[in-house]
Amino acid sequence: MTISCLLRIRPALAKSFFENGQRAFASHAAFAEHAKLERIRNIGISAHIDSGKTTLTERILFYTGRIKEMHEVKGKDNVGATMDSMELERQRGITIQSAATYTVWKDHNINIIDTPGHVDFTVEVERALRVLDGAVLVLCSVGGVQSQTLTVNRQMKRYNVPCLAFINKLDRMGANPYRVLGQMKSKLNHNAAFIQLPIGVESNCKGIVDLVKQKALYFDDQLGLTVREDEIPQDMRTECDERRHELIEQLSNVDDAIGELFLEEKTPTPQDLMGAIRRSTLKRTFTPVLVGTALKNKGVQPLLDAVLDYLPNPGEVENLAMIEKKGEEPQKVFLNPARDGKDPFVGLAFKLEAGRFGQLTYLRCYQGVLKKGDSIFNVRSGKKVRLARLVRLHSNNMEDVNEVYAGDIFALFGVDCASGDTFVTDPKLELSMESIFVPDPVVSMAIKPTNTKDRDNFSKAVARFTKEDPTFRFAYDPDVKETLVSGMGELHLEIYAQRMEREYNCPVTLGKPKVAFRETLVAPCEFDYLHKKQSGGQGQYGRVTGILEPLPPHQNTVIEFTDETIGTNVPKQFVPAIEKGFRQMAEKGLLSGHKLSGLKFRLLDGAHHIVDSSELAFMLAAQGAIKSVFENGSWQILEPVMMVEVTAPEEFQGTVIGQLNKRHGIITGTEGTEGWFTIYAEVPLNDMFGYAGELRSSTQGKGEFSMEYSRYSPCMPDVQEQLMREYQASQGIAVPDKKQKKKN
């Protein structure tokens, strides 16, 4: 039976799946419970904003029979994409939260996480990649590799996630998949090659060529349900032969079997190529590149086939846990992915969400089996929970299941936990899985309820959102008597402000954005501080000697403490108190009141008293030591620098460059393509506020930009002077003149 025959009967299959219930497994949930390990894929769909991720997911759900009809992003048909379940998402046409779903394709169960592309929601991508086995990296054939693509690529590398690349939007004016492949090699450092080629681009996009099987694929009828195989068009055969040879050549560099065939000048069979692509993709030494246009319903079914052929099942990925016993070094253990239930259950909570029926906790099962009615233990808190319901998720809809196995993604109700917690059924298992990397917030805003009577709802909203999203922080600043929220960008905080009004009927007022500046030393500074207090009875005595020194630039967002003492001048039981005193003082600097960072506290020596020394005495000694360094050291203020990418028609290039220069930007690169240009620049975040409106007005609404955090860097002398003056005015303090000169 040909592919076209198979796919012509898919609507009938979908009908029986949804309506007749005549299959052995009456629903996707039932099928998922019985799937074998080799027939499971856990994948994420990640990319830069507006690359077409949500549209692609909508097509996948339709072709696999999961939904009966397709809807568009931005809710143009008043419905909106299935995976954008939040009303705000459908209005703005962006994905804010990672929606989870599962579907079935060719008897394989596929769990899909659709992730946000906007940099302000990057923690959602982190959470998704942590629990996935493979990913589809979606790239726009016009925009190519953009700023958030670089971020997603780094995240995939951090969690060692194998990926396929899908170059989308072949139908767009200016589509150039060949340029995008070049960017993947130069900017992402991927060993990538086409395994498909487009048959025409823009309005002439007719289908794709499968270079592995050497066949042309056409997607007939309006919905693209029928995939028709045909011979490669005559005018494309030379190009296809060249690209296939390029594919074989790149595979030969990373796969021994293909390398031998290449040296012997033998032509590999399609089976040889598929085996080599799978092996090298799993090892992350090769990235297969597919093409298509999700909006025009071309290339989606072959992408699904590639997910089955080239991405790993849960048994092909090594998942580690740590055995953490008190007083012992943590031991690494490999978790058993077999779906036989012989080993005890181990799961990781990777996302929290307030649902209609209480808190919803998303988990991935890494080992064993979990059944409805079982009791689970939170390893961190030791709390025991009995499970009344197990559910699988389809966007914001739920299907109850009786049990879940290793490799499954599911959700629970009524479990009090934090994101990154490990759950087990055996309380003796002291296992902990690696937690999820959470970036520090870069922007703060003052926030308050518009009406004082809404304070209760405001408190509930803040408590829920800070629990759901670890990058959303909430604090009260006693110096300015303001409540502050911090996050990954203006959009991040604006979205939460709008959600407070929509979901809690609590309108809020946001203040002007405030940048998270940092303070650090320019050069090492020694300290020798004695804290001594005698007031009758037991006194206080503690002396600390050491060096406070700046860390290298790539570590300027952290602070470190090292105990380099020899002997018993500083008893070991007092060292944690010294570290505590240092970290408390690091919360507020002298120049601008911002946190200290990029510093290393080296404790070299000290002294104690047999009676008067205590933890409090040494903590106060450490604080006194930092105060002495405030007075004697040379300090500077650091500011977050953003990697900015601006795209606009080329007639506005001079204007855009001028605007970036005015905002203290450093141009790092430019690109041009068919009447459009892209500029890459590094700009201080403090200078980026209000840029969106300025860019729109100066480019007649045609320009767009994106930015992501790059690093902390010393701020300009005039900015440092201004920050110091503002802080002094608010505190009524004066700083010695020597502090106001930044030493290089």
Curated annotation (Swiss-Prot):
Signal peptide, first to last residue? none
The pathway is: Protein biosynthesis; polypeptide chain elongation
GO terms assigned for molecular function: GTP binding; GTPase activity; translation elongation factor activity
The organelle targeting sequence, given as a residue range:
1-25
Record keyword GTP-binding present:
yes
Q: Does the keyword Hydrolase apply?
A: no
Please give the function described in this protein's UniProt entry. Answer: Mitochondrial GTPase that catalyzes the GTP-dependent ribosomal translocation step during translation elongation. During this step, the ribosome changes from the pre-translocational (PRE) to the post-translocational (POST) state as the newly formed A-site-bound peptidyl-tRNA and P-site-bound deacylated tRNA move to the P and E sites, respectively. Catalyzes the coordinated movement of the two tRNA molecules, the mRNA and conformational changes in the ribosome.
Which protein are we looking at?
Elongation factor G, mitochondrial
Gene Ontology CC annotations of this record: mitochondrion
What PROSITE patterns does the entry give? Answer: G_TR_1, G_TR_2
Lineage of producing organism: Eukaryota, Metazoa, Ecdysozoa, Arthropoda, Hexapoda
Q: Which residues form the tr-type G domain?
A: 38-315
Q: Write down the SMART domains for this protein, in alphabetical order.
A: EFG_C (SM00838), EFG_IV (SM00889)
Q: Which organism is it from?
A: Culex quinquefasciatus (Southern house mosquito)
**What GO biological process terms are annotated to this protein in UniProt?**
mitochondrial translational elongation
